[in-house]
C-alpha cells in the first residue's frame, strides 16, 4: 500500500514537473500580475502603468468590446507613452465631443487576432524586414525588428517599441508599447 502511494506521488510529481513550462506565468505589468484568465480590460485596469489607457477606453466606450471574446491583440501604450503627446492632448481627447477621434486612435492599437511576438517576428522576417499590420481602426502599421525588439511604425512615421511582449489574456494578448500610435492626420 505504501509503495503504491509512493509510486502515485512520484508519477504525479514527474507529470507536474513536465507540464510546468506550459504554465509559465505572465509577466508583471505596472506592478500587477497579469492573469490569463482575465480579459484585456480587467488586466489593464490592474496595471498602474495603464491608467490613462483605461480612462481612454472608458471614454471611448470600448470597455464592452475589449471585454468580449476576441481574440484581440492590443498594443497598449503606457502612461509615459501618453505623456509624450503634446501638452493638453490627452485631456482634449477625453472630452465627450472628441469621442470619435479618441476611438479612432485607440482602435489603431487593436488587431483582430491573437498575435504573439514569435509569430509577428516571423511575419516581419518573411516580408523581408517590414510587415503591414491592419488594425480594427483602419490604420496600417508597419511591424519591424530593432535588434531583438518589435517596433511599430504608425501612418505618420511615429515609432513605438514593444517593451513587454506576449501578456496573455483570456481574449487575446497585450504587448506593452512606449509610444502612442496615431492615425494619419
For every predicted segment, state its role:
Residues 1-9:
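Bacterial N-terminal signal peptides that target proteins for export
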Residues 5, 23-185:
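Mature, structured domains of secreted/extracytosolic soluble proteins
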Residues 12-14:
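Repetitive helical segments and hydrophobic/amphipathic motifs
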Residues 16-24:
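Sec/Tat signal peptide C-region and signal peptidase I cleavage site
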Amino acid at each position: 500500500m505504501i509503495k503504491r502511494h509512493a509510486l502515485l506521488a512520484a508519477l504525479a510529481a514527474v507529470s507536474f514537473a513536465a507540464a510546468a513550462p506550459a504554465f509559465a506565468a505572465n509577466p508583471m505589468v505596472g506592478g500587477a500580475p497579469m492573469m490569463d484568465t482575465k480579459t484585456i480590460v480587467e488586466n489593464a485596469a490592474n496595471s498602474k502603468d495603464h491608467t490613462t489607457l483605461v480612462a481612454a477606453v472608458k471614454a471611448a466606450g470600448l470597455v464592452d468590446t475589449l471585454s468580449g471574446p476576441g481574440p484581440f491583440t492590443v498594443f497598449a501604450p503606457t502612461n509615459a507613452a501618453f505623456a509624450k503627446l503634446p501638452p493638453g492632448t490627452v485631456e482634449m481627447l477625453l472630452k465627450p465631443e472628441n469621442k470619435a477621434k479618441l476611438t479612432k486612435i485607440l482602435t489603431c492599437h487593436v488587431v483582430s487576432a491573437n498575435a504573439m511576438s514569435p509569430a509577428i517576428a516571423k511575419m516581419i522576417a518573411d516580408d523581408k524586414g517590414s510587415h503591414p499590420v491592419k488594425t480594427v481602426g483602419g490604420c496600417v502599421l508597419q511591424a519591424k525588428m530593432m535588434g531583438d525588439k518589435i517596433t511599430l511604425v504608425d501612418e505618420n512615421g511615429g515609432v513605438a517599441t514593444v517593451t513587454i511582449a506576449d501578456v496573455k489574456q483570456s481574449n487575446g494578448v497585450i504587448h506593452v508599447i512606449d509610444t502612442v500610435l496615431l492615425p494619419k492626420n
